C-alpha cells in the first residue's frame, strides 16, 4: 500500500477527534483540565455537549433565499440609477430642493456664493455641478487681458546676440555724440571765452553768447539741445532693435524686478525706479560735461595768461 499523505492523515485525525467529541463527555474532560470539583460554583458544562450532533461536511449549496436577495439588490440598483438620471435631467435650480446627494448641494452653494461675489454667470456641466476649473481659467484670461497679472508685465526673453549688438550701437552713438559736441562746440567756445584780448562782434546775439558771465546759461542750453538729440537717436535705435537699453543693462532695475509685488507699499515701483534712473542718466551726463568744461576753462585760462 502506498503511504498516506499528510493531508489525509490530518483529515483522519480530525474525523476521529470529531467523533470523540460527538460521543459526549466534554464537560467531564473540561472539569479535569481546570481541576474543578462537582460542587464548584463555576459551571463546567462544555458547549460541545449542548450543541446538536454534527455530521461530516457536505457540499455547500446556495441558500433558497439567495435568488430573492439578488432580486432585491437589482431593484435597489434600478432605483438608484433612475434617481441619478432624474437629477441629471433636472435644471440646476432644482438641485437645492434635492437633499439626496450632499456633494451636489455643496457645489451648488459654492456656485451661488461665486455668483453673488462676482456677479457673473456660472457655467455648469450637464450634471448640474459648476465647472470651477473653467471659471478659474476664464478669470486668468481676463486678468492677462487687463494686464493685472504679474505675467502680463513680464517681457519676453530677448536673444543675447541682439542685446549685444544693440549695446554696441548705443555705445557708438554715445561716443559720436560726445565727440561732435566737444570737438565742434565746447572746445572752441571754451578757448574763445577764456581769451582775454578778443574783438567784439557786430551782432549783439553773438556777443551775448561769448560773454563770460553768460557761460552757464549758454552751456546749459547747449546741453539740453544735445541731450535731446541724443535721446531721440537712442529711442529710434531701441525701436529698430526692439530692445530697451535700461531694462537689459541696469542692475538696479533687475534687482527691483525681483521684489515681490505688495512687499513695498509703492504702486508701480519698477516704473518709478526706471523713470528715476532715466533722469539720473541725463543729470549725470550734464554734470560730467560741466566738470570737464570747468577743468578745460582753467587750463585755457592758464595757457592764455602765459
Curated annotation (Swiss-Prot):
GO CC annotation, single: Golgi membrane
Compartment(s) where it occurs, according to its Swiss-Prot or TrEMBL record: Endoplasmic reticulum membrane; Golgi apparatus membrane
Topology of the protein relative to the lipid bilayer: Multi-pass membrane protein
Major subcellular location class: endoplasmic reticulum
Species whose genome carries this gene: Lachancea thermotolerans (strain ATCC 56472 / CBS 6340 / NRRL Y-8284)
Cytoplasmic side: 1-172, 235-281
Name by which UniProt lists this protein: Golgi to ER traffic protein 2
Topology, Lumenal side: 194-214, 303-306
Amino acid at each position: 500500500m502506498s503511504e498516506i499523505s499528510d493531508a489525509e492523515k490530518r483529515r483522519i485525525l480530525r474525523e476521529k477527534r470529531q467523533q470523540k467529541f460527538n460521543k459526549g463527555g466534554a464537560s467531564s474532560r473540561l472539569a479535569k483540565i481546570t481541576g474543578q470539583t462537582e460542587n464548584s460554583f463555576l459551571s463546567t458544562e462544555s458547549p460541545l455537549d449542548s450543541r446538536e450532533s454534527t455530521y461530516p461536511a457536505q457540499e455547500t449549496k446556495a441558500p433558497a433565499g439567495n435568488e430573492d436577495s439578488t432580486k432585491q439588490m437589482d431593484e435597489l440598483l434600478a432605483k438608484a440609477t433612475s434617481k441619478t438620471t432624474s437629477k441629471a435631467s433636472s435644471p440646476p435650480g432644482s438641485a437645492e430642493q434635492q437633499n439626496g446627494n450632499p456633494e451636489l448641494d455643496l457645489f451648488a452653494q459654492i456656485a451661488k456664493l461665486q455668483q453673488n461675489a462676482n456677479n457673473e454667470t456660472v457655467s455648469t456641466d450637464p450634471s448640474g455641478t459648476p465647472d470651477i476649473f473653467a471659471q478659474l481659467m476664464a478669470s486668468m484670461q481676463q486678468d492677462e487681458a487687463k494686464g493685472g497679472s504679474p505675467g502680463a508685465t513680464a517681457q519676453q526673453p530677448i536673444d543675447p546676440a541682439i542685446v549685444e549688438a544693440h549695446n554696441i550701437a548705443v555705445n557708438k552713438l554715445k561716443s559720436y555724440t560726445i565727440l561732435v559736441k566737444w570737438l565742434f562746440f565746447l572746445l572752441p567756445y571754451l578757448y574763445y571765452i577764456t581769451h582775454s584780448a578778443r574783438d567784439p562782434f557786430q551782432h549783439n546775439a553773438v556777443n551775448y553768447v561769448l560773454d563770460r558771465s553768460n557761460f552757464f546759461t549758454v552751456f546749459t542750453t547747449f546741453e539740453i539741445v544735445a541731450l535731446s538729440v541724443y535721446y531721440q537717436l537712442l529711442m529710434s535705435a531701441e525701436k529698430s532693435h526692439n530692445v530697451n537699453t535700461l531694462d537689459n543693462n541696469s542692475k538696479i532695475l533687475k534687482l527691483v524686478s525681483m521684489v515681490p509685488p505688495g512687499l513695498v507699499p509703492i504702486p508701480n515701483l519698477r516704473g518709478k525706479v526706471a523713470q528715476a534712473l532715466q533722469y539720473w542718466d541725463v543729470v549725470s551726463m550734464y554734470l560730467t560735461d560741466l566738470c570737464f568744461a570747468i577743468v578745460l576753462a582753467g587750463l585755457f585760462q592758464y595757457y592764455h595768461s602765459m
